[in-house]
């Protein structure tokens, strides 16, 4: 059954259809929220719950002229934007990183794992350092696998702007991570 057909079934009160949509999207949306909300797992889980609660309460909000995947990521993106406004993102951004770094396993003594962790931390920090619009575009493209067209729909911008944001984000990340070469370090 397509996602769009499942949404029609949800509108009719079909619990199994909701379970199927949840099964298809919950994990991916959790990963998306984790990246967009400073790796705050509790907040990300709350956002996934809230998003699916909206789907159950108001399935008629689904825009049938769009694909479900594009629509659900638009909703998720808007939830993140609202959170950014509440949190004064620029001032609070380091808190999520501090929590992330505190989880680092200091007892690890396998060199490859240590190097991979350093790279992942540097990548996460660089991703967080990107401004919101470039981070959103990069995350949707490279971490969530959306097409340029789908990203344009989610962010409500034209495809040329998406390409520009992706170019800038990639250039910034490449420059900030140039000291790492994970292929050689394996």
Question: Model segments located where?
Answer:
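C-terminal edge and immediately downstream basic/flexible tail or linker adjoining helix-turn-helix-like DNA-binding
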Residues: 5, 9, 39, 92-94, ...
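Internal acidic/polar
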Residues: 82, 90-113, 147
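Residues within helix-turn-helix
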Residues: 149, 160
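C-terminal flanking helix
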Residues: 26, 30, 52, 131, ...
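Short, charged helix-capping/linker segments at alpha-helix termini
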Residues: 11-20, 30-50, 159, 183-186
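A short pre-motif secondary-structure segment
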Residues: 137-141
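Arg/Lys-rich amphipathic alpha helix in sigma70-family domain 2
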Residues: 60-64, 74-95, 168
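Structural recognition of an alpha-helix C-terminal capping motif at a helix-to-coil junction
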Residues: 46-53, 66-78
